Swiss-Prot record:
HAMAP family: HrcA
Keywords: Repressor, Stress response, Transcription, Transcription regulation
Cited function: Negative regulator of class I heat shock genes (grpE-dnaK-dnaJ and groELS operons). Prevents heat-shock induction of these operons.
Name the record gives this protein: Heat-inducible transcription repressor HrcA
Molecular-function GO terms, alphabetical: DNA binding
Protein species of origin: Acidovorax sp. (strain JS42)
InterPro entries listed in its UniProt record: GAF-like_dom_sf (IPR029016), HrcA (IPR002571), HrcA_C (IPR021153), WH-like_DNA-bd_sf (IPR036388), WH_DNA-bd_sf (IPR036390), WHTH_HrcA_DNA-bd (IPR005104), WHTH_transcript_rep_HrcA_IDD (IPR023120)
Amino acid sequence: MLDDRSKLLLKALVERYIAEGQPVGSRTLSRASGLELSPATIRNVMADLEDLGLIASPHTSAGRVPTAKGYRLFVDTMLTVQQEQLPTVQLMPEQPQKVIANAAHLLSSLSQFVGVVMAPRRASVFRHIEFLRLSEKRFLVIIVSPDGDVQNRVIFTEVDYSQSQLVEAANFLNANYAGLTMEQVRERLKLEVDKLRGEIAALMQAAVSVGSEAMSGSQDEVVFSGERNLLSVSDFSSNMSHLRRAFDLFEQKTQILRLLDISSRAEGVRIFIGGESQVVPFEELSVVSAPYEVDGQVVGTLGVIGPTRMSYDRMIQIVDITSKLVSNALSHRK
């Protein structure tokens, strides 16, 4: 446990480093902390903080900078989020893809870092299904979602079906299962298979199988905006290795998606500093994220990706407000 003096000095050091981006020395801290302490005493406290892994000394400077561990302690115990007057913005309830793209742009423009939004996860609900015969034992399954999205999949069957059988299967599915998820339909079919003719049941089960894959196939898409903002961040512009790693991360997307998936299970804003998540092993990056909802159900996550040296209180506000805007826009879309 840190004593009050050590906490105050660490807080002053982190805030000064975030504001100026330069290693902070003992003389600077003696003026900034408000404590009546000599530079020598402050140096001793800084040495203790360094031993604890909370700050570090760059090779090129006598000053100190916060480590990921130091940032974490600062965020968890010392950060005070003051209400800041952010620009009044609104996300119009348009098509989900447009809302997501606009939200990513809003996050990047407000933060001047990288905005990221994981697209809503769609439950594999269908509104309407049709079958079209392409050739012998080869059929097209046409599935329409509640929001009008159309998915087509080709299936191959062991038996050939007549047009009347295709209509019979489609009518049964539409009359009894429209509005359910494909998983719910699959379970219901298992229970009702004895009531159906065997070949018709097999056709419907094949359709549900490809339908489940089709309706969930666009999940876990992620939209980035403002990647070029990192070119203006000294922490990256002065280190091409860091910059390349960041852009590789955005291009591959997999690690970011895993991190956002973790965030979707949290309540409110969550902060990942450096490589502490072990999902994105990048000490120079932090992610501030929050889930968003549609009609009260969490369907995705959004956030800001930037250097560990960021104004966390401001990022928390930006992410929190944007998540509420997205939730509102998607929930009220008609």
